[in-house]
Structures are given as C-alpha cells and as structure tokens.
Amino acid sequence: MKTKFKHIWLFILLLILGNSIAQENKKNIYIVPIQDTIDLGIPSFVKRAISIAESNNSELIIFDIDTFGGRVDAATQIKDAISATDITTIAFINRRAISAGSLISLSCDKIYMTDG
C-alpha cells in the first residue's frame, strides 16, 4: 500500500514538474515513473498516465524505469497500453530494467540508459 501511495505522489509531482518544464520549452511531455516491483497496481497507473497524456495532446511520454521486475502479467498489460498509444514513447532506464522492466522498455519507441 505504501508503494502505491508513493507512486501516486511521485507521479503527481513529476506531472507538475514535467508540465512546468514543458511549458518553458512549449512542448507537452509526460514523465511516468515505473520503479520498484512491478505488481498488479502498476498497469492501471500507467494506463491512467497514458490517458492523461493523450487527452492533453502530449508529444512524448518518458517512462522512468528502475526495477528488478515483478509480475509478467502486469508487465504485459503495461506493454499493451504503451503499444496502443500513438504518442512517441521513450524508456529511460535509470539504473536497471530487469525481467518485467525489460519487457516494458522494449515496448517503447526508443530506449535510453544511464551508466551502471
């Protein structure tokens, strides 16, 4: 429960910060964190984020990924949601994308990684 609450607050914070940065650059970019264990709560979070980005005519969605993995069925739902959007998607692998995280990353249009 704490993880879901943390994800929701982080998502709201990133939306606010992402929107303020995008306003300065006149681009509509959304950053969606996918961190910690991939469980069955994450797909609805990602679907909601994609829906918000679509309704706001976003040009780009960046998925900030740092996970050891988790449930493959949840990752498959996330993959399907990412594949269904017409918005350009980027997986930013911030340290690790193992197992389910790899599947999610591969569903994006582009993948970028940090060292390590």
Residue ranges and their predicted role:
Residues 9-18:
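Bacterial N-terminal signal peptides
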